[in-house]
Design a protein with these regions (language model features):
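Conserved "cap/hinge" positions at secondary-structure junctions
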Residues: 13-14, 28
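Short, isolated positions in well-ordered beta-strands
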Residues: 17-18, 33, 65
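Short acidic/polar mixed-charge low-complexity motifs
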Residues: 14-17, 42
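Intrinsically disordered, low-complexity, charged/polar segments
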Residues: 41-70
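Short, solvent-exposed secondary-structure boundary/capping segments
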Residues: 27-39
């Protein structure tokens, strides 16, 4: 998957759609991790994305299957 950008819509395995409002790139031990802030409907969520998998303690988790770029 390409690098995530503001305005992208991320589609997850369960059908959840996350509209990306902001993204930051973090480098850690030679890995690039994307910190994504976005909205699902009207709810704001934050998550970390690495290798097309989103994970956070109390945010969005799961595999991203598609990235739509309007």
């Amino acid at each position: 998957m390409k690098m995530i950008q503001e305005g992208d819509i991320l589609i997850f395995e369960d059908g959840t759609e996350l509209k990306v409002d902001n993204v930051e790139y973090l480098c850690h031990d030679g890995r690039t991790i994307q910190y994504v802030e976005g909205t699902i409907g009207k709810d704001i969520t934050y998550t970390y994305v690495e290798n097309d998998v989103a994970s956070s303690i109390n945010g969005l988790n799961g595999r991203i299957i598609k990235c739509l770029r309007p």
